[in-house]
Amino acid sequence: MNILIFEAYSDANIGACALVENAIALLRRRYPAAAIRVMAREPGVFRNLYGVDAVPDVFEYPFLQPRWRQVIWLVRALLWMASCWIAAGLHDRDRLRTTRVPFRSKIEDFLWADLAVSVGAERINDKFFKNIVFSLYTYALLRRIGARCVIFPATIGPFLFGWSRRLARRVLSGVDLIYTRDEASLEITRGLLGPGTGTVHGTSDIALMQEQIGRDEALTIIGAAGEESIVGISAMRWSYFRNRIETPYSNFEAYVREMALLADTLIDEYGVRIVMYPTNYPVHGCREDDLGVSLEIRSRMSRGKDVTVIEELPTPARLKGMLACSQINVTTRMHACILSTGAGAPTISVNYLFKVREHMRSLGLEEFSIDIEEFNSQWALETFRRMWPERERWRAHLERAVEEKQRGILDAMKYLDGVAR
């Protein structure tokens, strides 16, 4: 069996890299004889990291390019998309493999695959509306050419526009198997497709299966002594598009200011070492820059000299090992939160989408969670003060809860057998 893992993006998005790593591990565990290929924006990196065949993403998005280049890219993309769609309707799978059709190179890897597994995780929602159409097109094209399509645990929704909801309903109804990673996504998807559908199953984000490096190695990377009390912070630049609520804090300037004030106060009151953990680095085709945000927060602090920023891109295993060294982590990125809680570290989350809040709720940590539009240093300090004396209890609680979720992920993989037949 040939398995294509697609929508893998870049290793410089550490969450995306963790999804690829653990998708490979889960699929190899269940289908050891299968050939696995990864489709990613930077395929060479995944080839080197995991020893798998890797190919370029079918959509080479023109991120951060001038507008005229983006327009040209869009015209070309629409041309090959239409051509491949028509060809897939005129020819069956075997004939497509042998017939010369325009732009066949674009679908060569889809024709190779018996099973195509998306690890995009959060592309089917209107907060990332620039991607949703291309992702839904890919799922529909896979079905049209006769490949079986599976969406690995993902956030589905929110849908802010009627057209996107209707399009998602139409396309997702043809996907062979959909895993959601939170209860809200499960409810939304079943609402789209109907409550009785057997193609939708709820489980947890597969990054919870991530392995981690040991404590000594992690402390060496951080540059910290074993007896130091570390508090980790993961920050990001958020667009504040269609805010759930408007407050004095629902903007990026306020987010940076409040995070800097929080870090300064924690150093003054608790004598902790603050370590900033970016999870998106502006290399290897990654368009997000959490490193820049971390440096900006540090520059706004009065105690910035006491802050360490992890400036070199780590692997998911290294990041998780470093997060495990913290007494408490304050996270914004989804996968920083998942890797932190997965490492058993007591975690306070700032939720930029409901998926983060849902993850915290599923672990019994909702009281330590706030939406990004409302995040402020006073709330964060009060929450930190509640968690600090109870942190060892929460660490033990997390270890039990994560083990249960890991068992649930492994059990949910049984549904693949009905598709990968």
PLM features per residue range, with description:
Residues 1-421:
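Active-site anion-handling motifs in enzyme catalytic cores
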